[in-house]
């Protein structure tokens, strides 16, 4: 009776210093997903890594996972508000990619793999780097007081909005494709949470549509299976992320989208109302309300906002202004 070939795990879990040292001694290029315990590894890039493993092979390309809180060597990466991918070759750091930016990850992997092949085959000098971004101005963790209570928060001072990949797109296995297109459009995904919305959540979320004839059908659809709830920001400047995301989604009705914006997400992945694949906030005010409703455990603040003089009420920023993640979110 023939024995089955043992399947090799895509990403090796590095949980001890010994395993870290073993990783550094590996021949070739190793891509390490350094993640925070409260949010877990970066799932959207797994399909990319699987694809590259098939195309490139595992002889010189390796993938690993490492929780920042478990390894002293990763102390400076603790509390970071976005995924961090460290590239190691010959035991040295050769590249860093921040954010779940699939096109950039793919390019960096191919470039660094080619460079390492030349080091091994031709004796070329390996280009080693230091992660210069680990400076005070880029620290995501801020220890301060909020309403008189001590809190640990992770802050990203860029405008953000809510996006939902709806149950119809998730059920058809289109989540990874949509996430890839979101990233290619220049968005950074700060949070990606998969869960099934409750009926109470959906009714409150879509209360502005309660008078529409198809409201009950919409409620049933949104409760029918898991959705992916995303918090998006833009990787380029402070442009209106809400409006930009609505443009990428396309018209609400997939049939209209296919006529007017055939490259939009709803044109490509929607079928008919209410199965239009994705949701986006209507405006900045709506984004504030939706983010607060679906992510009640997240804290929103603007560290640059100061109380006005003359006894006026203190100015506050909504969720679209600055996003703060409690470090202990499950």
Swiss-Prot record:
Keywords: Cell projection, Cytoplasm, Cytoskeleton. Its main location: cytoplasm. Residues 157-303 are annotated as: NDK. Residues 11-115 form the Thioredoxin domain. GO terms for biological process: CTP biosynthetic process; GTP biosynthetic process; UTP biosynthetic process. The keyword DNA repair does not apply. Detected at very low levels in testis, lung and brain. It is found in: Cytoplasm, Cytoskeleton, Cilium axoneme; Dynein axonemal particle. One of its GO terms (molecular function) is nucleoside diphosphate kinase activity. Residues 307-322 have a biased composition (Low complexity). Belongs to the NDK family. Shows no detectable enzyme activity. This is Thioredoxin domain-containing protein 6. It comes from Homo sapiens (Human).
């Amino acid at each position: 009776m023939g024995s089955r070939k043992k399947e090799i795990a895509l990403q090796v879990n590095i949980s001890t210093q010994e395993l870290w040292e073993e990783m550094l001694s590996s021949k070739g290029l190793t891509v390490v997903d350094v993640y925070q315990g409260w949010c877990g590894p970066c799932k959207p890039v797994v399909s990319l890594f699987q694809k590259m493993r098939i195309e490139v092979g595992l002889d010189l390309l390796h993938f690993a996972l490492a929780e920042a809180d478990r390894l002293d060597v990763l102390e400076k990466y603790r509390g970071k508000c976005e995924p961090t991918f460290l590239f190691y070759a010959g035991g040295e750091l050769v590249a860093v990619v921040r954010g779940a930016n699939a096109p950039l990850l793919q390019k960096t992997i191919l470039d660094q793999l080619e460079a390492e092949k030349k080091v091994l085959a031709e004796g070329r000098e390996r280009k080693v780097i230091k992660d210069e971004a680990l400076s005070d101005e880029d620290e995501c963790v801020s220890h301060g007081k909020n309403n008189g209570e001590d809190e640990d928060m992770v802050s990203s001072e860029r405008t953000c909005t809510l996006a939902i990949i709806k149950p119809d797109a998730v059920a058809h296995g289109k989540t990874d494709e949509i996430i890839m297109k979101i990233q290619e459009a220049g968005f950074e995904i700060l949070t990606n949470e998969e869960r099934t919305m409750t009926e109470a959540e959906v009714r409150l979320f879509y209360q502005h549509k309660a008078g529409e004839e198809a409201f009950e059908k919409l409620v049933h659809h949104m409760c029918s299976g898991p959705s992916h709830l995303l918090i998006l920001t833009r990787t380029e400047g402070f442009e209106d992320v809400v409006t930009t995301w609505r443009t990428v989604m396309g018209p609400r009705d997939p049939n209209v989208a296919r006529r007017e914006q055939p490259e939009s997400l709803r044109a490509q992945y929607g079928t008919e109302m209410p199965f239009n694949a994705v949701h986006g906030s209507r405006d900045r005010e709506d984004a504030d309300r939706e983010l607060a409703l679906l992510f009640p455990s997240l804290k929103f603040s603007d560290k640059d906002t100061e109380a006005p003089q003359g006894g006026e009420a203190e100015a506050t920023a909504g969720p679209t202004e600055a996003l703060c993640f409690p470090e202990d979110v499950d």
